[in-house]
């Protein structure tokens, strides 16, 4: 299997796109090849090409590459992202509305990264602080509590769960 993979890689392909059965995939995974890692492409576009990125010839090339690898492309405009970073919540929302987009490229990139890696965040809140914790999707509440402190996992009693959108609506 490694011989076939070597030929595949020498032809300029990534290990991610190498077709094989589950047993061979498990063997190949032991090599810990960088090109086996999941990938997201961030396409930096200028302000003019950002609104209609699918008509941009360079973006199409990146899309085709990503499609061959089963990857996702996130269009971003670094100049707009820099402007967005300087704005507060209400100004940011108005700016994004004027651009006709719901989220900044950075927010979309973060969400896509979390999804690709199978991660979610949960929030804890107390009198002094509110904090976000990153865990694997599907982690049970006691194990999530253990991320904060191992004593919390051992003495876990219950979790009070609120949907993020419901929390933001308050």
Question: Where are these predicted regions, by residue range?
Answer:
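C-terminal-of-GTPase-core extension/linker across diverse P-loop GTPases
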Residues: 1-170
């Amino acid at each position: 299997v490694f011989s076939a993979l070597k030929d595949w890689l020498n032809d300029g392909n990534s290990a991610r796109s190498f077709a094989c059965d589950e047993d061979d995939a498990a063997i190949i995974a032991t090599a810990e090849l960088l090109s086996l890692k999941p990938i997201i492409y961030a396409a930096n576009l200028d302000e003019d090409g950002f609104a209609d990125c699918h008509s941009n010839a360079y973006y199409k090339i990146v899309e085709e590459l990503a499609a061959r690898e089963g990857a996702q492309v996130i269009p971003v405009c670094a100049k707009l992202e820099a402007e967005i970073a300087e704005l507060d919540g209400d100004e940011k929302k108005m700016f994004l509305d004027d651009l006709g987009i719901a989220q900044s490229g950075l927010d979309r990139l973060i969400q896509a990264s979390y999804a690709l890696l199978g991660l979610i965040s949960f929030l804890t809140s107390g009198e002094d602080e509110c904090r976000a914790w990153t865990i694997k999707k599907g982690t049970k509440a006691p194990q999530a509590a253990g991320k904060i402190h191992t004593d919390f996992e051992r003495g876990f009693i219950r979790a009070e769960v609120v949907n993020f959108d419901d929390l933001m609506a308050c």
